[in-house]
Regions:
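GST-like domain detector, emphasizing the conserved glutathione-binding G-site
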Residues: 1-8, 14-86
Length: 86
């Protein structure tokens, strides 16, 4: 399952959440507000503290940058991809 590390008020995170909803993709949300344990862990684990962060464990992908994430989601899970798999 896709995982999204994000925080509520971030416009870049909102953009990715909208794309996930538009494509009707299930994902696990990891809210990571300032001062949270998840945010601290993420900085140590990934070595970078940038949001949003999309993790696609099936494809071993860790991705920052909302535009890159949205393009990846569209290319990998977009409507044409879903229809061809049915």
């Amino acid at each position: 399952m896709l995982e999204l590390f994000q925080f509520e008020d971030c416009p870049y995170c909102q953009k990715v959440r909208r794309k996930l909803e538009e494509l009707d993709l299930s994902y696990l949300s990891h809210p990571s507000p300032s001062g949270s344990v998840k945010r601290e862990f993420l900085g140590r684990f990934v070595g970078e503290l940038q949001f949003p962060l999309l993790v696609d464990p099936e494809k071993n992908i860790f991705m920052f940058e909302s535009d890159d994430i949205c393009a990846y989601l569209e290319k990998t899970y977009g409507p044409s991809k879903v229809k061809s798999e049915r």
